[in-house]
Amino acid sequence: MVFVAMRVKYQFGSLKSVHAVVYGLFIFDPSGGDTMKICRANALRLWEEYFGNSQFAEDFHGNLMCRDGYGDDDFYVYRFGKRIYCGWNIHHILPLSCGGTNEKHNLICTNIYTNDEAEDKITYWIDDCLYQVQRVYGTGEHQIIKIN
C-alpha cells in the first residue's frame, strides 16, 4: 500500500487582513502561500498534479477514485463483478475549523466516503484504521498519520 502524507503550513494568532491577487484559477496571497478556490476546474488541476493523466487512483486510506467522478457520490465502476463507488472530492488535511486553510498544501484528493468519515476532525476512524492529523515537529506543517 502506498501512503501519501500531505503537509500544511498554517498560522495561529489574530486574524490579519490579507490582500490577495488572483492569477488564473489560483489565488496567491502576499505572505507566500497559495490559496485555491475549491471548484471542479481546480480539483481536476490538483488531481493532475498528484496523479498525472491517470483515470484511477487510491486515496490515503486505499479507497478507489475515478477522475471522472469528481463531486459525484453515486459514481461507481464494476470491478470483479462488484460495484465500487469511486466519486471523489477535496479533503482539508487540517480542517478549516481547526485552523486549516485552502492552501494547496492542505488539500488532498479523497474518495467521498473517506472524506465523509474524516469530517472536520483531526482524529478519526475509517473502517478499522485510526488516523490523526499531527504537526511535524519544529514546523507549522501537518500530515495525516495512520496510528494503528
What do the predicted segments below correspond to?
Residues 2, 7, 17-23:
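N-terminal amphipathic/hydrophobic targeting modules at extreme N-termini
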Residues 5, 34-35:
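Residue-level detector of intrinsically disordered terminal segments
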Residues 37-87, 111:
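Short cysteine-rich loop/turn motifs with clustered Cys
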